[in-house]
A protein has these predicted regions:
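Hydrophobic, aromatic-enriched interface-forming segments
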Residues: 140-159, 163-185
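A short, acidic, flexible beta-alpha connecting loop/helix-capping segment that sits on the rim
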Residues: 261-269
Length: 295
């Protein structure tokens, strides 16, 4: 029987878009070597910029995980060149494969699944891939369609000898995450899941990203909740959400769950907060163990 984790912060990763060299160097001082740094892509971010940033992450002893947006590639040749360069300059073995925000595909790849099906990932040394999960749903795609697409991506990757994991959109409440995880664990009990969580961030900044990423929906009522919370504190903190998730882990069972932090408030600020959280957990565990031994 798989041991249940004590906290989702175990094995955490962090995400940014185009962090500066100085920001990456500072991050490397704060976090363990080999920490995964996901590098997101947007329409205004060039492939050159993304790979150059991944190279900086790699030479600083961290593990870059490139977001690869299928719809951004105009030709198969362009994708081949990108994968070859990623392997050559960043030693990439792990990527997050997404469809991308473009309304229309620039070429033959219209979805993450079509790119995974191409067979090019394993040809260029990719051994692990992340695929997107949406515990809070998607504003344009039904829940049934999301699950069907997720299953197809997982099965296609596994058939190609690539180990898949699920990286989710960031969420604000534990209940929908735990309900979604329960369903995922029943379908794919051994597939690792990275739970998207916003790091410490100003409420105005957080709301901007929530709207941009489709997290702010009428059903979730996030805009109203963030507005109310901003009257109590200046900065959003994910501590309560992590506490609620840790409490709910026993209901789901199994391991292979970890937090994936979106560093909307900056890499250094997020990493510093994580270090503090880990220190708190360590002290709490140590205190409980001491008390147990004295009984």
């Amino acid at each position: 029987m798989t041991e249940v984790q004590s906290s989702v912060i175990e094995g955490w990763s962090i995400e940014s878009t185009l962090p500066k060299k100085s920001e990456v160097e500072k991050l490397a001082e704060l976090v363990p070597a080999g920490t995964e740094v996901y590098l997101s892509t947007l329409p205004h971010v060039s492939l050159d910029q993304q790979i150059e940033t991944a190279h900086i992450v790699r030479v600083n002893g961290l593990e870059p995980v490139l977001h690869v947006a299928a719809r951004y590639f105009a030709t198969r040749t362009e994708l081949v060149g990108y994968l070859a360069r990623a392997g050559r300059e960043t030693a990439a073995e792990n990527m997050l494969i997404i469809g991308g925000d473009a309304d229309r595909p620039n070429g033959e790849f219209d979805s993450a699944l079509s790119l995974i099906k191409s067979g090019l990932l394993s040809d260029y040394g990719i051994r692990r891939i992340g695929v997107a999960g949406y515990p809070d749903g998607h504003p344009k795609i039904s829940s049934d369609a999301l699950i069907e697409a997720l299953g197809a991506k997982i099965e296609t990757a596994q058939a190609a000898g690539i180990a898949p994991h699920i990286t989710t959109q960031f969420c604000f409440e534990a209940a929908p995450i735990l309900a979604w995880l329960k369903d995922i664990r029943e379908r794919w009990p051994d597939v690792p899941v990275k739970i998207g969580i916003a790091g410490p961030t100003g409420f105005k900044t957080l709301l901007k990203f929530a709207v941009r990423c489709g997290v702010n929906t009428p059903r979730t009522g996030i805009a109203q909740k963030l507005t109310m919370a901003s009257k109590i504190a200046k900065t959003f903190s994910p501590g309560d959400l992590l506490d609620d998730l840790d409490t709910g882990l026993g209901q789901i069972g199994g391991g292979n769950l970890s937090a994936h932090f979106f560093s909307f408030g900056g890499l250094e600020k997020t990493a510093t907060w994580i270090a503090g959280r880990l220190n708190e957990k360590s002290n709490f565990t140590g205190t409980n163990e001491t008390q147990r031994m004295q009984l």
